[in-house]
Every structure is written in structure tokens, then in C-alpha cells.
Curated annotation (Swiss-Prot):
Binding partners and assembly: Monomer.
Binding site for L-homocysteine: I431, G432, S433, E484, D599
Record-listed L-methionine binding positions: I431, G432, S433, E484, D599
One of the record's GO molecular function terms: methionine synthase activity
Positions of Zn(2+) binding: H641, C643, E665, C726
Gene name of the record: metE
Catalysed transformations (reactions): 5-methyltetrahydropteroyltri-L-glutamate + L-homocysteine = tetrahydropteroyltri-L-glutamate + L-methionine
Keywords: Amino-acid biosynthesis, Metal-binding, Methionine biosynthesis, Methyltransferase, Repeat, Transferase, Zinc
Residue positions of the active site: H694
Pathway the protein acts in: Amino-acid biosynthesis; L-methionine biosynthesis via de novo pathway; L-methionine from L-homocysteine (MetE route): step 1/1
Protein name per the record: 5-methyltetrahydropteroyltriglutamate--homocysteine methyltransferase
EC code: 2.1.1.14
Length: 753
């Protein structure tokens, strides 16, 4: 039984973000559709060749997407919302872009589809929309075309297809409500047609992704798998593919399916290999997801070998990445600024392919010398002073319950804060950032490249902060911000100023569409060598008599939007960040900053996939926030901000944060999100966002007043703040001024009654 290797998918964007540049050029009308398609062909050919050269046996085809793979599947099935359809009923790449972005070079603009997180990753997918009575048919042949492309290049191909049950699970019903699972029988004929076409092309194995099988699914959804896969069997061999968690809780459902193989994530799941081997049908292939597709760390291949060696020769076996390598940067070799020691600890997508080749060869031959050589830097890292800081570890171990408690309860603090700030009813503020103009971005870039000295850079930033204060005073806002001109990204900025993080030059990963992010990497214990935000906050406060908020990104968000260490728990990392930022709160307070905002937009999105694991996560997530904030005195007002999400199932935890004021995104839900706070009888102050900053549209005074009156029916007016939904970084100054002027006017009208 020869062991093969494969990946579940490969990054799409290109080493230099070629796909992003081609997409945005096409959207702007600066290049043709054919030029865009040519970039896609070139990237696919390059990525297949790179994987093959790195030693991958079976190449994934169908993992490439022009915007998002869930959206690609929707088009494959003919699932195009009516507002995005071409008049002649055809489907083309602009149809896809209209669904993803709301507009494209051709066709009428229409509201984009909803976007949300892909399971518990930082990748986003476009949510399929379902309406009663809709029809499905094969309308978008991208998968088949790309299989033809790869076969023509002589590759050994393994098509990748998102499975029918997971695709339905990820979608939402629009309009008249019905059970979306009832659509399953309507989409199966399209899947049958696709599998038949693949069989005609001589395809042996198809990777059919059903990550929903790692969730705690309702019984009706689990029951749907058997009839679905009964309908799909027989044309090609199916590798049922799961990831992001283990499958043991749903293994009875899985083993009843007529498939020929199962892929399991042996990195994030707690599945026992021996138990899997015992319970899987003996003629099934097991694809062992041993190499972490979601992180950047070199694998301990001697450990991975030991994990799987006992079943070698006992069943058909492949070794693989735990999930698609989409979530990893492409190539470590182009990182020239990382020092040799730190660089030796990492493996990006291409290096992970090499790891799979080494592992396959060792399992086939029994010779593990190459594995030991590869794993040597991991042993060295365990003892590196870059990783371990005894002072941080000692401080973390000394945390007591008192460290996460404010001195007094909210009611006492609120009285002290009212006496200090004397704010009017319906106080107005913004969430933190102001427009990042071309001038600001150029200033930062010139400084980063060494084209501008520190003095001139600081003078430039100070001028932009001064402008932000002048603008806010002119508008009549009550609580001001400094505008964050010095910050490129709310996580990267803090990572750059904390020990324990490193940054890459080209470590880009796709977030959605053409948006890529370059997450910081946590390599060791985290500490704050010097104050981070104090100087600019103090300067901004010196320009005005009104309170200026200090602005921090919270510990859970910094954790969730970084590549974490694997040698300590996420809880440990979050609490180390919390302790570092606790010192920042104390220093801001000492500098005269009386209102400090600690943003936690990622608190909810960091939830584990299984609800049974939520309590433990929320307990340490809340504790980390409180450690960060609890050093503040009674008359220092702590704010937090959370982006658009469902709050009702975590209201206990939101209240437990004990922030004096929480600002939330609510305008898109027409204040309906406040229902959770009303039902819970949330005791502290709330700033429900009164307009959507993602749109350039300027809300009218009447619109904002109406929303605030609606909010006051749910939350007592004396506990309401008036603010936009989110930061204003991506907006231009003209619409920002106009929208904020109307917001301030609406608040003033309500004060007059």
C-alpha cells in the first residue's frame, strides 16, 4: 500500500498578490476581461507546478476562485439572486462580481450578498441566498474548465467540490421563510451531472468538502447526509473531507455513507487515529490531515510520523494538510528581513508541501532521518530566549481574581464619571478612526521606506491629528478621538510595539474577494517595552478642553487576527496581551486621558465551532478584557466597541465585560440588535450605531432621529450614546463631515425634546 500525499487547496492570490491587482484593475476599467482571465490561468498553472515540484502527488483543482469558493459553488448550481441576474439569463464572471461586490464592469448594480466568516477562520464567504420555489441547474462550468486545463498540462488531478449539505447549511432563506434543507433534492441532480462530467474525464477521486460534519448539527441535517450521498455514489471515488475540528461525535453518521474515503483534521481535532482506524470501514481510504493549513509554524515531523505510523500498511492512507492552504502565506523563501533563527521556525504553503513530501517518503520507506533533521529547529525554539520571558510568565502566574475587578460597581463609577465629564444627554462621539487620506498613507509609507526622517514624520502626523480635533470641535461632537493617522491597521500597529510579535514582508492571506491581510505572528511571550498610544493621545488632549478617547485594540481581537503560537494556549496569549495593555491603560490615565476605548470586534467570531466549547472560551476572553481594563479608576470611563454580530447568545458575557459604555453596529439591523440588550436588561451605557459607515450615503437628520427614538424605546435615553456604526477610516472627508453634522444635529434636536 503506497502512501500518497495531497493538499486540500492552495493560496489563490499569488506571491505578489497578482490576483488582487488583476481584479481591481478589471473592476476599475483599466484592463479587459481576457487580461483578467489570463492572470487566473497563469496563477493556476504556476501553483500546480509549484506544488508538483515540492513533491505533491495529487493536485487540487477547483480550489481557485475569482472571489470566493462558496460563491463559485453557488454559480455552479445556478443559484444567482434575481437582482444580480443578466437580462438574458446567462451567467458570466461579472455576475459573480455583482453578487460579491454589488457591481461589476457590466450589468446593473445591486446590493451585494451578505458576507460572513468561513467557520472559525479569518476568511469570509458570500452567503448563498435561497427563495421558495427556485430552480437549480449547471450554469457555471469553472470547475470542469479548470480540470481540463490541469489535465492538458499533464497533472494528476483531484477535483475539489463543496458538498451539498454544507453548501445549504451555509446559506440563508430570503423573503418567505421555509426549511432550506428542503432544497437538497433539487440540487443533487446538478452534483450528479458534475460528477458524471468528471468521470468522463477519467477522474478517479473527487474531494467533496463537508466541513459542516464537524459541527453540532441538528439531527435533521445529520439525517440528510445518507440520502444525499446515496444519490451521489458510483460515478467516481468520493473523499469525504472535513476540517477545523474532529469528527468523532458524528462518526456514526459518516461511516454509514457510501463514500470511499474520509479526510480528517488531525491538527485541530481531538480524534484518535487508532480509534478512527478501528471504526472506519476497512476498505475506506484515510486521508490524515497532519500538517496545519492554518498557521505558519514548521511541523514537528517526527511527532507527526509517530501519530500515524501504527496504521501504515493496515489500510489505504494519504497524508495531507489539515485544511486548505488558503489560510497560509505562500512562500517563506522570499522573506528576506526575518532573521535566520526565527525564519527557521516557520513553514508557509510551499514549505508545508515539502513537509508532506518528507512525511510521505518516511512513511513509505521507514527512514526517518530527514524528519529529524527538518524538526531540529523546533527543538531549539523550545528553549529560545526569543520565546520565553520569565518576567512575563511570572506576572501571568501571579494574576488573582482582584486583577480583573474594577474598584467599584458600574453605578458608583457612573456617578464619578458624570461628575468628571458633565456630558449632555445623548452624548455624541465617533468610534476612533478618521479618513485615511492619500496624504496620510503616503506619509507613513515614506517613513517606512526611509524616505522621511522621524522628525518630519512626527510633524506630519501631528498636523493630521490637529486637523481631526479641529474638525470634531467644529462639528460639535462631545467626546473626541485623535483619528489614528499613525495607524496602518488596528492589530498590526499594536503588534509592532509589543515584544513577542514578528511581521513578514509578503505573508499575505486572502480575507475575501481582493482583500488580503498580513497577520502578525506571535512568536513568544508578549510584553510592552514602552508606552504605545500615550504620546499622541496626550497631544490630542492638549488641543481641546473636550475629553479625547484613548484607543486600544483588545487582547482577544489581537489574538484572533494574528497567527498564534502553538506551544501555549490561546488563553495564555490573550492574558499576556491583556497584561501588556493594562499598563497602557494605566499610562493613559496618568497622562490625563479620562475615557479609554478597548475594541473587541473579534470577541464573538473567536467562538469555538461547537457550542459545548463556548463557555470555556468566553470565560477567559472576558477575563482578558477585564484584566486589561480593571486598573482604571472609577472616574475613568472604559468603552468597548463590537462590530455587527448576533449578541443574544452571548449577552451574559458582554455584560460580564463590565465596560462603562459599549458601542455596537446596529444601523443595518434597524436597531433590532438592541432587542438582545433590552431583553437582558443590560445595565450599562450603549451607543447603538446610527449610520452605516460602509456606505458613502449621508444619512438625514430625520433618519438618525428616528433611529434614536426607536433605540430609546428599548434602552433608557439617559444611558444612550450617539455614534456611527464603526470607524471612519475608509470614508472620505466630505461624506464624513456631512454625516457627522447630521448626527450631531439629531442629538441636539432630541436634547431640546
Amino acid at each position: 500500500m503506497t502512501i500518497l500525499n495531497h493538499t486540500l487547496g492552495f493560496p489563490r492570490v499569488g506571491l505578489r498578490r497578482e490576483l488582487k491587482k488583476a481584479q481591481e484593475s478589471y473592476w476599475a476599467g483599466n484592463s479587459t476581461r481576457e487580461e483578467l482571465l489570463a492572470v487566473g490561468r497563469e496563477l493556476r498553472a504556476r501553483h500546480w507546478d509549484q506544488q508538483k515540484q515540492a513533491g505533491i502527488d495529487l493536485l487540487p483543482v477547483g480550489d481557485f476562485a475569482w472571489y470566493d469558493h462558496v460563491l463559485t459553488t453557488s454559480l455552479l448550481l445556478g443559484n444567482v439572486p434575481a437582482r444580480h441576474q443578466n437580462k438574458d439569463g446567462s451567467v458570466d464572471i461579472d455576475t459573480l462580481f455583482r453578487i460579491g461586490r454589488g457591481r461589476a464592469p457590466t450589468g446593473e448594480p445591486a446590493a451585494a450578498a451578505e458576507m460572513t466568516k468561513w467557520f472559525n477562520t479569518n476568511y469570509h464567504y458570500m452567503v448563498p441566498e435561497f427563495v421558495k420555489g427556485q430552480q437549480f441547474k449547471l450554469t457555471w462550468t469553472q470547475l470542469l474548465d479548470e480540470v481540463d486545463e490541469a489535465l492538458a498540462l499533464g497533472h494528476k488531478v483531484k477535483p475539489v467540490l463543496l458538498g451539498p449539505v454544507t453548501w445549504l447549511w451555509l446559506g440563508k432563506v430570503k423573503g418567505e421563510q421555509f426549511d432550506r434543507l428542503s432544497l437538497l433534492n433539487d440540487i443533487l441532480p446538478v452534483y450528479q451531472q458534475v460528477l458524471a462530467e468528471l468521470a468522463k474525464r477519467g477522474i478517479e477521486w473527487v474531494q467533496i468538502d463537508e466541513p459542516a460534519l464537524v459541527l453540532e448539527l441538528p439531527q435533521a441535517w445529520l439525517d440528510a447526509y445518507k440520502p444525499a450521498y446515496d444519490a451521489l455514489q458510483g460515478q467516481v471515488k468520493l473523499l469525504l473531507t472535513t476540517y477545523f475540528e474532529g469528527v468523532t461525535p458524528n462518526l456514526d453518521t459518516i461511516t454509514a455513507l457510501p463514500v470511499q474515503g474520509l479526510h480528517v483534521d488531525l491538527v485541530h481535532g481531538k480524534d484518535d487515529v487508532a480509534e478512527l482506524h478501528k471504526r472506519l470501514p476497512s476498505d475506506w481510504l484515510l486521508s490524515a490531515g497532519l500538517i496545519n493549513g492554518r498557521n505558519v509554524w514548521r511541523a514537528d515531523l517526527t511527532e507527526k510520523y509517530a501519530q500515524i505510523k501504527d496504521i501504515v500498511g493496515k489500510r489505504d492512507l494519504w497524508v495531507a494538510s489539515s485544511c486548505s492552504l488558503l489560510h497560509s502565506p505562500i512562500d517563506l523563501s522570499v522573506e528576506t528581513r526575518l532573521d535566520a533563527e526565527v525564519k527557521s521556525w516557520f513553514a508557509f504553503a510551499l514549505q508545508k508541501c515539502h513537509e508532506l513530501a518528507l512525511l510521505r517518503d518516511a512513511l513509505n520507506s521507514g527512514d526517518t532521518a530527514a524528519l529529524a533533521e527538518w524538526s531540529a529547529p523546533i527543538q531549539a525554539r523550545r528553549h529560545s530566549t526569543r520565546v520565553h520571558n520569565p518576567a512575563v510568565e511570572k506576572r501571568l502566574a501571579a494574576i488573582t481574581a482582584q486583577d480583573s475587578q474594577r474598584a467599584n460597581v458600574y453605578e458608583v463609577r457612573a456617578e464619578a464619571q458624570r461628575a468628571r465629564f458633565k456630558l449632555p444627554a445623548w452624548p455624541t462621539t465617533t468610534i476612533g478612526s478618521f479618513p485615511q487620506t492619500t496624504e496620510i498613507r503616503t506619509l507613513r509609507l515614506d517613513f517606512k521606506k526611509g524616505n522621511l526622517d522621524a522628525n518630519n514624520y512626527r510633524t506630519g502626523i501631528a498636523e493630521h491629528i490637529k486637523q481631526a480635533i479641529v474638525e470634531q470641535e467644529r462639528l460639535g461632537l462631545d467626546v473626541l478621538v485623535h483619528g489614528e493617522a499613525e495607524r496602518n491597521d488596528m492589530v498590526e500597529y499594536f503588534g509592532e510595539h509589543l515584544d513577542g510579535f514578528v511581521f513578514t514582508q509578503n505573508g499575505w492571506v486572502q480575507s475575501y474577494g481582493s482583500r488580503c491581510v498580513k497577520p502578525p505572528i506571535v512568536i513568544g511571550d508578549i510584553s510592552r517595552p514602552a508606552p504605545i498610544t500615550v504620546e499622541w493621545a496626550k497631544y490630542a488632549q492638549s488641543l481641546t478642553d473636550k475629553p479625547v478617547k484613548g484607543m486600544l485594540t483588545g487582547p482577544v481581537t489581537i489574538l484572533c487576527w494574528s497567527f498564534p503560537r502553538e506551544d501555549v494556549s490561546r488563553e495564555t496569549i490573550a492574558k499576556q496581551i491583556a497584561l501588556a495593555l493594562r499598563d497602557e491603560v494605566a499610562d493613559l490615565e496618568a497622562a490625563g486621558i479620562g475615557i479609554i476605548q478597548i475594541d473587541e470586534p473579534a470577541l464573538r467570531e473567536g467562538l469555538p465551532l461547537r457550542r459545548s466549547d463556548w463557555d470555556a472560551y468566553l470565560q477567559w476572553g472576558v477575563e482578558a478584557f477585564r484584566i486589561n481594563a480593571a486598573v482604571a479608576k472609577d472616574d475613568t470611563q472604559i468603552h468597548t466597541h463590537m462590530c455587527y454580530c448576533e449578541f443574544n447568545d452571548i449577552m451574559d458575557s458582554i455584560a460580564a465585560l463590565d465596560a462603562d459604555v459599549i458601542t455596537i453596529e446596529t444601523s443595518r439591523s434597524d436597531m433590532e440588535l438592541l432587542e438582545s440588550f433590552e431583553e437582558f436588561d443590560y445595565p450599562n451605557e450603549i451607543g447603538p450605531g446610527v449610520y452605516d459607515i460602509h456606505s458613502p450615503n449621508v444619512p438625514s437628520v430625520e433618519w438618525i432621529e428616528a433611529l434614536l427614538k426607536k433605540a430609546a424605546k428599548r434602552i433608557p435615553a439617559e444611558r444612550l450614546w450617539v455614534n456611527p456604526d464603526c470607524g471612519l477610516k475608509t470614508r472620505g472627508w466630505p461624506e464624513t463631515r456631512a454625516a457627522l453634522a447630521n448626527m450631531v444635529q439629531a442629538a441636539q434636536n432630541l436634547r431640546r425634546g
